[in-house]
Amino acid sequence: VKDELEGTVYCCFEEGEESNGGIATMMKALEKYTVDECFALHVYNALEVGKISMVAGPRMAGAVRFDMTFHGRAGHGSRPDLSINPIVPAAHMVGELDSALRNQLNAESIATLGLCTFRAGDTWNIIPETAFLSGSARYFDKEAGPQVLDLIKKSAEATASIHRCTVTYEPTTKVILEPVINDPAVAARVSDGLAEMCGADVLDQDCGRWYASETFSRYMEKCPGALGLLGIKNEKLGSGAPHHNGKFDLDEHAMVLGACSELVFALKN
């Protein structure tokens, strides 16, 4: 196969794709290379093993991350009027954010909200000094990212003010990743090549886009590319639980189709 290649294939392996754990180092390393096109795979629990989704257009979501701390004034729980309880605005934000996104953003922006961390206090009778809230919002419209971030901050500041609190943000509160939008030409070339090598039945045309996020969008700033979703679900084996669930597992037979897709990309480029 190597004799059939015209050019050079670079293989990239990175850590922490949603958290941007390794992408800055990777992009710096790629500066000295000329890259024409890029390709990536992500295992996907909703697809049966032996299937791959390789289609044009939006495939994985962009992400806004927020890490905010509400500041009040600590005191005894018996006299909340003499304290300023930061838990109150933080708790209001749990419902407020979802309502704000639904009512103030274009419905076609399809933003979703995930509230994943709420920390405040350490005992039953003391009002704490601070309350911490973090999570993310996902979107497929590139223009939605800054709008979502602005709306989150305005909602937090207004809610904090109503309850006599202030709010601060960690530097991580920002648009962390843009949507992965497959280039039509690259996606079609890989899809056609897979049909030729493995048969058209391996291609899943009905797989919806995925709301998780990927640093592959950063690679696509450098050159056109496409990302495939590789099926790993096998009920007989017991695989197919949601990603980041304690029961998550994969059918390793899926890796064969994954390797074939990478080979097709290299040969058809």
Q: Predicted regions: what is each one?
A:
Residues 88-269:
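Metal-dependent amide/peptide-bond hydrolase catalytic core
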Residues 2-128, 214:
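Histidine/acidic-residue-rich, glycine-tolerant segments that coordinate divalent metal ions
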Residues 1-2, 236:
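Residues that cap or delimit alpha-helices
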